[in-house]
Amino acid sequence: MNSADFLLWVRGTGLQIATVIFVFGVVLRLFEILTLGHKKNLAVTRGSGFKEGFRNILTRSLPRDKNTLRRSMFTIVTGYVLHIGLFVVIFLLAPHISLFEGIFGFGWPSISTPIVDLFAVLTMIALLAILYHRLTNPVLKFLSTKQDYFVWALTFVPLITGYLSYHHLFLNYNWMLGIHILSVELLMIFLPFTKLSHAFTLFIARWYSGSMMGEKGVKS
Amino acid sequence: MSEASLERGIAALKEQIDAPVAAFFSSCTHCGMCADACLFHTETGCPTYTPIYKVEPMRRLWEQEYTLLGRAKKALGLSKPITEEELEKWQSKVYNTCTLCGRCSMVCPVGNDITGMIRKMREGMSAGGFAPEGLIGASERAVEIGSPMGVRLPALKAQIKHAEKDTGLAIPMDVEGAEYLVLLSSMEIMNYPEYLHAITRIFHQAGKTWTLCSEAFEATNSGIQIGSSDIAAELVGRVVAAAEKLKVKTVISPECGHAYTAIRWEGPNLVHKEFGFKVQHILEVLDELRAEGLLKTEGIEEAKLTFHDPCQLVRRGGVVEQPRNLLDMIAPNFVEMEDSGVMNWCCGAGGGVSANEDADKVRNKAFNRKKKQLESLDIDVVVTACANCRIQLEDGLEINEMDIPILGLTEMLAEHLKEDKPVEEETS
Amino acid sequence: MSHDETLKESLTRNGVSRRGFLKFCATAASIMALPPSMVPAIAAALESARRPSVIWLSFQECTGCAESLTRSHSPTVEGLIFDAISLDYQHTLQAAAGDAAEEAREEAMKENWGKYILVVDGSIPLGNPGYSTIAGISNLDMLKETAKGAAAIVAVGTCATFGGIPKANPNPTGAVSVSDIIKDKPIVNVSGCPPIPVVITGVLAHFLTFGTIPELDELGRPKVFYGNNIHDRCYRRPFYERGEFAETFDDEGAKKGWCLFKLGCKGPITYNACATAKWNEGTSFPIESGHGCLGCSEPNFWDMGGFYKALSQPAVDVSQTAAYALGAGAVAGLGIAALNRKKKADVATDHQTVTIHDLRRNDPSKTEAEDS
């Protein structure tokens, strides 16, 4: 297989396979979660669980109180850099937007590539810091499973290969681009079945906890 | 009589796993922030006390029983089953080092209600026979005697007599049609009878009708702490029956955290029906009286004081502003503790920890968090609204040789009650 | 022209002076990206080089490659180099026809066995040998037979190098490239549809100078010409960096000469010398004319999902696939939901109420303590 065949495969068959598993997995996981049901709360509620659930979806992304911020500073800061960085890199790079345009039929404006590049670097630094933290912090070292390191790699490889292919470093661009796309496909394949599923289940989790707390009148 | 078994425990966990739990487990990224929020971790530095790790067996069960991949792995013999040894090992994580305080649920960035899951985990632990002896004993006493501390009606009656003598007011018992049914915690009966005095006087001033019930005076619920909905339902059922029999409008949960959770929030779900009466914490009632102008105080508390928010009231109960409104009336020198309100640190003894001797050592260690909070304030008095917090605060301060008195908010208010006759006394 | 004549003799015969010859050597060096210090060595090599015999076979092709080469205007280095070889068989160009033509090939092969250069344009059909024959001989047979005595093979054009358009999906003739068939000879792939003329002659100049084939990339192409990416050498690259893209061929962006990425330019994955060597006597290359690169020097360029589809867009229809996967996920989800609900209903039905008498397991030591 030469680089052109490889590139064609990852843009074609590989993408098909990844999409099938990704979509299948996400839908399956949503069914697995939602059909387990949740008993109706019979206690007289103080607030609208529905409203508070949605509020929690948004507000959980904001920093908590300043002491929590101080105590979990490393996790919170690297977490923000990672997630904002991923957002910029995935959704604001012109070639990525044109990919979404190709799939969904609509696009949005891109930002200039060197800025995306900067975010990619920041995101990778954040991920390296997160890995270091995971390897050295007693709690994280204790909690971490093989899957935690595996999904770290699943997230890091698309970034580094994207960076290397953009800068035409290390390997021939076609190979690098192919590996980049393949690494994203691997990410898609494993996302619904690993803790990376938080990318979409977090909305459900936040909604449930927000509404349960909201019904008690607690701002979650 | 049947007995607990691993199978019953697992079946109970299977019953507990629902959509929120599945969403929570799907969303945890092992970020470790819950550990930073848990006083059992912050004060011991022990990573095994990380809140999400306390429900790890339940996570595996969820995966094995309720996901397609997990089911396949289980069918192929690739998954690790839950064993007796494992759950025995988990007892200290689930019971000794968790007060169900809910701080972890507040900080979790993906919004997992970890505390709620530990509560569910306890269902499996108790049904499986993995609950600590201390909580089993408390549950037995609660069901058989009517109080986890073994307080019987005669003891209450003796306290009523004292209170009637001290206040010069009659304490109503089993009065049908009263507005409020007042519940007490055993600790209030045995250690803090001032509470009974206080509400007697406050209701008298407010001109409200109220009653105690000889068949259901105990508000605490060991079933909630041990994590058995069946036992909790039996205990709540007594209160519900009493409230219905006496046709009261409102049942008042006393100065106790988990009792409020048990009756106010879990109660209707435990007995599977909506209540025909209201449930309020005493602070909610007092704040309502204040707003209606029925709670009149005079004088002020000179001491510099702070308020310790009981977890079950603030984070798990939504009673945050009421104590502050009430303190506003009498305490100009009130200062907030760091992290006060919904983010307040637990005293370290809630959720059954105080009833569990195995947890004594770690409970005292966890108290260091509260000690640091109080030390930084330089205050004369700590006010709270939970008898269990109060005992732990007293114990902890004594061990740490800190001489700060602890007061219940209700009783402090009563001390400043304006001595005038209620306008509607005759008509009430 | 005899095969024994050296290049120098040939050039002299054509009235090229010593000075002109050295100038030619310098140009050849620059084509091959060699330093000027190499010029004397090149001159020495070329002076004594014998004009090699070249046999040019054309299979499934459009003659565009030969056109590209022969349309280059003289006097050019390309032309000079073609004077320096003995093109013994090229059925488009040669005067002979029929049996005579084939005899010329056979004779050239016999005379120069082991020394001649075989140039091939066009792909070879494997589906049915009858799809393409010359004088009754299938392309496959002719290639195999002619390749046997070749010193080296130069595959010219994307059809000969990678199968090209004949191989495009669904590849009705079963077309393959030269390197798919010949495994035991050095092959230089000069891809492009067509290749840049100077690239073809550059390879021949290299062979004449050094008697070897140039250094090749992983696709068998001379690195000298295929080492650079069109995108990297593109004068519109700054617009790509700034995120300024033409969205249609007649919008403002197109008029301002913005990047053509979104209009399907394959520059980022195309390796060729177009952006530097340019076409039509160095006039321009396609992007300068306002059209994206088609990636014609790359394998499968016809099947990369569409010339006007951005490179980052899927080469296939993903939406349809996703819709099926959604359905399958829902079916599997409903299945697992039914199983889960049954499991939950079962444990609820079998639920034995936990009383205070059920809080201990059957642990003899504990039971005794309890009883006492």
Residue ranges of predicted features:
Chain B
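Iron-sulfur-cluster electron-transfer modules
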Residues: 8, 15-25, 55, 59-269
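Iron-sulfur (Fe-S) cluster-binding segments and ferredoxin-like electron-carrier domains
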Residues: 36-65, 106-125, 318, 352-366, ...
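Short cysteine clusters
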Residues: 28-34, 38, 98-104, 108, ...
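Cofactor-cradling patches in redox/metallo enzymes
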Residues: 187-275, 312-329, 335-428
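A short, charged/proline- and glycine-enriched loop
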Residues: 175-180, 299-305
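Active-site glycine-rich loop that binds ribose-phosphate moieties when present
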Residues: 233-239, 285-293
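Conserved beta-strand elements of the Class I
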Residues: 181-182, 306, 380-383
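Long, charged N-terminal interaction/targeting segments
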Residues: 8-51
